[in-house]
């Protein structure tokens, strides 16, 4: 039978291992998501076209501009850009979009606007994965050192 102090010591080790497993699984899922996002972005880069556009207003500072452009088919599109960019009001910019869905796919033709999502998810996934493996490794080492050897 395990003593009270033995039970108290076992719980943190079990918790450390459990947290390590959860963080490793979450990190793995995020890394898979980042890989899928990167593949989607590569396909977008292959099939999209680039046209000139203009910043018509800043919604919440320079990182959230409203962009207007005209597609190659002559359609006028205006869309809000996400936060991985920094531009000034009235600036001329390049816009990249998929011809079959310009309003849904438009984004500035900059590294951050195009690859920011995949890199953010990948970076977070790597941190979760490494942190989880570290906790798992630490918990397993503590568990092994606490076992009685026969």
Report the location of each language-model feature.
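Structural detector for short beta-strands of small beta-barrel domains
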Residues: 47-59
């Amino acid at each position: 039978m395990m003593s009270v102090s033995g039970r108290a010591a076992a719980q943190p080790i079990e918790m450390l291992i459990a947290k390590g497993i959860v963080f490793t699984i979450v990190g793995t899922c995020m890394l898979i998501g980042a890989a899928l996002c990167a593949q989607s972005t590569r396909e977008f880069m292959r099939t999209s076209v680039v046209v000139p556009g203009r910043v018509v207003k800043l919604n919440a500072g320079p990182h959230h501009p409203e962009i207007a452009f005209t597609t190659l088919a002559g359609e006028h599109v205006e869309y809000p850009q996400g936060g991985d960019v920094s531009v000034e009001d009235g600036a001329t910019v390049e816009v990249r979009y998929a011809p079959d869905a310009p309003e849904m796919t438009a984004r500035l033709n900059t590294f951050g606007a195009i690859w920011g999502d995949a890199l953010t998810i990948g970076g977070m996934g790597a941190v979760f994965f490494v942190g989880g493996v570290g906790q798992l490794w630490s918990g397993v080492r503590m568990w092994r050192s606490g076992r009685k050897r026969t």
